[in-house]
Regions:
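Periplasmic-binding protein-like
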Residues: 1-22, 30, 34
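Short, solvent-exposed coil/turn linker segments
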Residues: 2-5, 80-81, 116
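Short, structured secondary-structure boundary patches
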Residues: 4-7, 21-25, 130-140
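Weak global preference for isoleucine
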Residues: 8, 12, 17, 86-89, ...
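A generic structural micro-environment signature
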Residues: 8-9, 24, 29, 126, ...
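Secondary-structure end/capping motifs
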Residues: 25-114
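Conserved C-terminal helix/tail region of periplasmic/extracytoplasmic solute-binding proteins
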Residues: 102-154
Length: 154
């Protein structure tokens, strides 16, 4: 069997990454991005005409068609609602997946020169836990804007 991402559930994420200072200085950007994301999720997750059109468009953009894209979606863990995304990123499963990703990244030399262990970089999780170096945080999982979306407060 050819390797595909279904063999490592929870390890590959569709997410938007924004520089921490940029987001801090421009909170409207965070609101707009998260709002647009979940607006699209709401549309894509339905069998409405708009949902079908969105999946057909994204299928074409993914070098396949609507059926091929829907087959890909069927093999993925999708977070159609903000509350589902919040629950996942705060879970032990997400913590373990991020630990696995950083271990893999270190083993493959993806953490850069000078990385002497998987702890070289830090990953901040939403519950306040950190994987790796707390003085060298390079990735933060922050649920603030997802919570706003869940609360209808964007």
């Amino acid at each position: 069997r050819v390797f595909d991402s279904s063999q490592i559930p929870g390890h590959i994420k569709d997410l938007t990454i924004v520089n921490t200072e940029t987001l801090r200085d421009n909170p409207a950007l965070g609101k707009a991005l998260v709002g647009a994301w979940f607006e699209l999720m709401a549309e894509m997750g339905t069998d409405s005409e708009e949902g079908q059109k969105a999946r057909a468009f994204l299928g074409g953009a993914s070098a396949t068609d609507q059926a091929g894209y829907e087959a890909q979606l069927a093999g993925m863990k999708m977070f159609w609602q903000p509350a589902d995304a919040i629950a996942f990123i705060g879970s032990d499963e997400a913590y373990e997946a991020m630990d696995s990703v950083r271990q893999f990244s270190f083993e493959k030399g993806l953490l850069g020169e000078g990385a002497d262990s998987p702890d070289f970089v830090g990953i901040a999780m939403p519950d306040g836990k950190t994987l790796g170096d707390t003085a060298n945080i390079k990735l933060r999982f922050d649920t603030e804007y997802m919570q706003m979306a869940a609360d209808g407060a964007l």
